[in-house]
Swiss-Prot record:
Its main location: cytoplasm. Belongs to the enolase family. Its cofactor is Mg(2+). It catalyses: (2R)-2-phosphoglycerate = phosphoenolpyruvate + H2O. Pathway: Carbohydrate degradation; glycolysis; pyruvate from D-glyceraldehyde 3-phosphate: step 4/5. GO terms for biological process: glycolytic process. It comes from Moorella thermoacetica (strain ATCC 39073 / JCM 9320). This is Enolase. Its EC number is 4.2.1.11. It holds the Pfam family Enolase_C. The active site is at E205 (proton donor), K337 (proton acceptor).
Length: 428
C-alpha cells in the first residue's frame, strides 16, 4: 500500500526569485506527497551543501537542474519499490548514495526534497495530517512565533548591523491570539516608521528595513510599536535578536560597520548583557561567531540562566556540533533548519538530542522560502514550542502561520500554547 511507485523532481522558484528543488513522491496506493526546499542568505560554513549548477547563462549560476537530475536519474531508480513508511531506512539510503560528509555529491537540496516528500506521501496514504504522522498521539503543542519584523544585516540594505529584530508574543493565551498580537505589532511598527519619515518597504522575510541610526534605536522603535499596539513589552510581547555574528566576525573581532565599532569576544558578551539588562530580550541567536567556542562558553555562563541563547551557525542542525556544544556548555538552544542537515531523520535526531540535554529547539524557515508548510507540521509533531518563520507578511511566511492556525483548530481542546513555558530552561 505504501510502496513508492514514482519520484519526480522539478526546478521551481523561491521567494527571492532563485531556483529551488521541488519533489513529488507517488505511492502504489495513490498516496502522494510534494515538498519544496528552502535556501538561506547567511549560511553557516558547516551546513550541508546546496547543489547549484554554476551555469552563468541560467539564473546567474543559481540553477538547480543538476540536483533535479540527481533525483530523477539516480535517487528515484534506487528508491522506487521502497516502503515510504520506512523513513529512517530511506534517509539512510539517501545519505549512503551521496557518500560525502556534507551531502555535496547529490546535493542536500536534492536529498531533503525527497526525504520530506516521502514523509508527506506516507502521511497521505494513511489519511493522517503530517504532524500526527510524524509526532503520534502526543503531538499537541503549538509554537510561540519568533517574528522577524525589523531587518538589518544581510537581509536588508541599511546601516543596522544586527540582522533580525523579532517579537515573541509569549504572553498570549493561544496561537491564534499570538499571531494576532504579532500582526498588530507589525502594523503598529509600520505606522511608527511612517511617522518618523522612514522607509516601510519589506525585506526577504517580510520585515521592515528602515535606515535607523543604530541597533539600539531599532530596539526602541520595536518597543514603541508594541506599546502603541496596546501590549506591554516584557509581559505580553518580548524581543528576540539574531545578530548573525559570524557575518560580523573579521580577524578575531566583531565589526559593527553601521555603528563604526569593533568589539572583542569579551566585549560582545558585555554588550549583550547590557542590552538584556535594559530591554525585555528573551532570546539571542548567534550572539557570537560559529567558531568562537570559548566566547560562546563565556556568553552562556553570563546569560544562559536568563535568556535563550540559540545556536544557528554554531550548530547548523548537526548532532556532532550540538554534542560538542552540550559538552562545553555553549548556548542553551538550537535553531532547527531542515536544509542545514538535509534529511528528516537527522532533523528529528537533532531535536531529540537538544531536548534530552535541556536545550530548547526553535524550528526555522530560511530567508529564501516557498509556499511549502512542512515546518509548521514538524514544530507541532515534536512539541518544540517555538517557530521562527518571518513577519506576518509575504505569503511564503504567512503560509506557515496559516497552517498552524488550521492545526490549532483541528486539535481543538487538546491544543496547548506554551507561552513563557516554551523557555523551560530559563530561571524566571
Amino acid at each position: 500500500m505504501t510502496t513508492i511507485s514514482d519520484i519526480y523532481a522539478r526546478e521551481i522558484l523561491d521567494s527571492r526569485g532563485n531556483p529551488t528543488v521541488e519533489v513529488e513522491v507517488f505511492l502504489e496506493s495513490g498516496g502522494w506527497g510534494r515538498a519544496a526546499v528552502p535556501s538561506g542568505a547567511s549560511t553557516g560554513a558547516y551546513e550541508a551543501v546546496e547543489l547549484r549548477d554554476k551555469d552563468p547563462k541560467r539564473y546567474g549560476g543559481k540553477g538547480v537542474l543538476d540536483a533535479v537530475n540527481n533525483i530523477n536519474a539516480i535517487i528515484a531508480p534506487e528508491l522506487v519499490g521502497s516502503d515510504a513508511l520506512d523513513q529512517r531506512e530511506i534517509d539512510r539510503q539517501l545519505i549512503e548514495m551521496d557518500g560525502t560528509p556534507n551531502k555535496g555529491k547529490l546535493g542536500a537540496n536534492a536529498i531533503l526534497g525527497v526525504s520530506l516528500a516521502v514523509a508527506k506521501a506516507a502521511a497521505d496514504a494513511l489519511g493522517l495530517p503530517l504532524y500526527r504522522y510524524l509526532g503520534g498521539v502526543n503531538a499537541h503543542t503549538l509554537p510561540v512565533p519568533m517574528m522577524n519584523i525589523l531587518n538589518g544585516g544581510k537581509h536588508a540594505d541599511n546601516n543596522v548591523d544586527i540582522q533580525e529584530f523579532m517579537v515573541m508574543p509569549a504572553g498570549a493565551s493561544d496561537f491564534a491570539s499570538a499571531l494576532r498580537m504579532g500582526a498588530e505589532v507589525f502594523h503598529s511598527l509600520k505606522a511608527v516608521l511612517q511617522s518618523k519619515g522612514l522607509n516601510t518597504a519589506v525585506g526577504d522575510e517580510g520585515g521592515f528595513a528602515p535606515n535607523l541610526r543604530s541597533n539600539v534605536e531599532a530596539i526602541e522603535v520595536l518597543l514603541e510599536a508594541i506599546a502603541k499596539a496596546g501590549y506591554e513589552p516584557g509581559k505580553d510581547c518580548f524581543i528576540a535578536l539574531d545578530p548573525a555574528s559570524t557575518e560580523l566576525y573579521k580577524d578575531g573581532k566583531y565589526v559593527f560597520a553601521g555603528e563604526g565599532v569593533t568589539r572583542t569576544s569579551d566585549e560582545m558578551v558585555e554588550f549583550w548583557a547590557s542590552l538584556v539588562d535594559k530591554y525585555p530580550i528573551i532570546s539571542i541567536e548567534d550572539g557570537l561567531a560559529e567558531d568562537d567556542w570559548e566566547g560562546w562558553q563565556n556568553l552562556t555562563k553570563r546569560l544562559g540562566h536568563k535568556v535563550q541563547l540559540v545556536g544557528d551557525d554554531l550548530f547548523v542542525t548537526n548532532t556532532e556540533r550540538l554534542s560538542r556544544g552540550i559538552e562545553m556548555g555553549a548556548a542553551n538552544a538550537i535553531l532547527i533548519k531542515v536544509n542545514q542537515i538535509g534529511t528528516l531523520t537527522e532533523t528529528l535526531e537533532a531535536i531529540e538530542m537538544a531536548k534530552k540535554a535541556g536545550y530548547t529547539a526553535v524550528v526555522s524557515h530560511r530567508s529564501g522560502e516557498t509556499e511549502d508548510t512542512t515546518i509548521a507540521d514538524i514544530v507541532v509533531a515534536v512539541n518544540a514550542g517555538q517557530i521562527k518563520t518571518g513577519a506576518p507578511s509575504r505569503t511564503e511566511r504567512v503560509a506557515k502561520y496559516n497552517q498552524l492556525l488550521r492545526i490549532e483548530e483541528e486539535l481543538d481542546a487538546a491544543a496547548l500554547y506554551p507561552g513563557l513555558k516554551a523557555f523551560y530552561n530559563l530561571k524566571k
